[in-house]
């Protein structure tokens, strides 16, 4: 049995980026997100019979994410992003502790309410490198949004607005997990560890109504 508890914190800054370009019809800002994550591991029980790897008590994520979601034409757009970070328990920092992730998704506006999506998500894990990204987004009105989308489906509803922020509630799915490096006790060298799962989450989020400033 393996248990993990996670704590993640991040803040998103929206910066002007090609605002006057004809390839950015929606004036999409460049989104910069520095973040930090902590994982608290419990298990698995290591015995001579199972030969499981003994995991560290803690691992950490330190990353910066950039994203840009331009609308190139009234029909075609994109969702682009790159994340670079260090994923380790800090016992020993090696080249494998660095990970580069990204996503490149093309969008097609079928109707004012429906948008089709297809692309790839690069995870840079030891076992799973790439995932296909395919699905559609349905926005029936200004107060609801449905992402029927692999690997991150989501349904969200806008409840109210507080100052310059819209308050949304959501239910979402996610292909979760990650990859870390650590120095295993009694083992010379660095161990690379993958953890993969499927997650369901409920929550609220506050989204700035304006396109600039601190968002997270």
Which residue stretches match the model-derived regions?
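Residues on the lipid-exposed face of transmembrane beta-strands in outer-membrane beta-barrel proteins
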Residues: 9-17, 62-70, 102-110, 120, ...
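Membrane-embedded beta-strand positions of outer-membrane beta-barrel proteins
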Residues: 32-36, 80-82, 116-118, 146-148, ...
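Outer-membrane beta-barrel translocator domains and adjoining extracellular loop/strand segments
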Residues: 1, 43-51, 90-97, 128-135, ...
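Transmembrane beta-barrel domains of Gram-negative outer membranes and organellar outer membranes
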Residues: 1-92
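Short loop/turn motifs that connect adjacent beta-strands in outer-membrane beta-barrel proteins
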Residues: 17-31, 70-77, 110-113, 143, ...
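Transmembrane beta-strands of outer-membrane beta-barrel pores
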Residues: 36-44, 70, 84-90, 120-126, ...
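Outer-membrane beta-barrel translocator/channel fold
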Residues: 43-54, 150-216
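Residues that define the transmembrane beta-barrel architecture of outer-membrane proteins
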Residues: 3-9, 56-62, 94-100, 128-132, ...
